[in-house]
């Protein structure tokens, strides 16, 4: 049984997050290990394993990039944990520009304003990539969708680094 089936959801990138959360709570209650405290040891073990499976499936499905990776793996394109580099030269150049810009933020006269502008720019590109990911997954174009996931991982990492940089400004 795959994660979508476990939660009674149609297999796809777009999903009903309310149904996901509601079903998660129901399954958590149904298979919580405490409910099996007086059951035979074998049933307790099954309950613990099932609870772990439910938690993992929920975390995977509620997180868009993890959901996309999982969906791609179900379709035969497993990119989870891969270290493949992108072949998209323009995106690679964009990465370099963003990295330089992040490094240059330290010398800005108004770092807070520069961070805000930079975050908006990256957020806009993130949104465009998410739209492309949604469309390519719906169309079954898994190779392009996999590239979108790779790009989104980079953008997410850059946003995390920007957040850490911003935090360091306030710690000084």
Swiss-Prot record:
Gene: hscB
A GO biological process held by the record: [2Fe-2S] cluster assembly
Top-level taxon: Bacteria
Name of the protein: Co-chaperone protein HscB homolog
Keyword Chaperone attributed: yes
GO CC list: iron-sulfur cluster transfer complex
Top-level taxonomy: Bacteria, Pseudomonadati, Pseudomonadota, Gammaproteobacteria, Aeromonadales
Keyword annotations of the record: Chaperone
Subunit structure: Interacts with HscA and stimulates its ATPase activity.
A Pfam entry, by short name: HSCB_C
Gene Ontology molecular function: any one: ATPase activator activity
Domain J as annotated: residue spans: 2-74
Keyword Chaperone: yes
HAMAP family membership: HscB
Family designation: Belongs to the HscB family.
Function field: Co-chaperone involved in the maturation of iron-sulfur cluster-containing proteins. Seems to help targeting proteins to be folded toward HscA.
PANTHER family in UniProt: IRON-SULFUR CLUSTER CO-CHAPERONE PROTEIN HSCB (PTHR14021:SF15)
């Amino acid at each position: 049984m795959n994660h979508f089936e476990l939660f009674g959801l149609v297999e796809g990138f777009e999903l009903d997050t309310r149904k996901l959360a509601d079903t998660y709570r129901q399954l958590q209650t149904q298979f919580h290990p405490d409910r099996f405290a007086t059951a035979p040891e074998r049933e307790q073990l099954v309950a613990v394993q099932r609870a772990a499976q439910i938690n993992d499936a929920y975390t995977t499905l509620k997180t868009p990039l993890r959901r996309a990776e999982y969906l791609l793996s179900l379709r035969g394109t497993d990119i989870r944990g891969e270290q493949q580099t992108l072949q998209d030269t323009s995106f690679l150049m964009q990465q370099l520009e963003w990295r330089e810009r992040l490094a240059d933020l330290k010398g800005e006269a108004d770092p807070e304003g520069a961070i805000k502008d930079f975050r908006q720019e990256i957020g806009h590109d993130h949104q465009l990539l998410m739209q492309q990911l949604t469309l390519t997954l719906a169309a079954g174009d898994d190779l392009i969708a996999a590239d979108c996931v790779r790009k989104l991982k980079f953008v997410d990492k850059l946003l995390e680094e920007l957040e850490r940089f911003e935090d360091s400004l306030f710690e000084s």
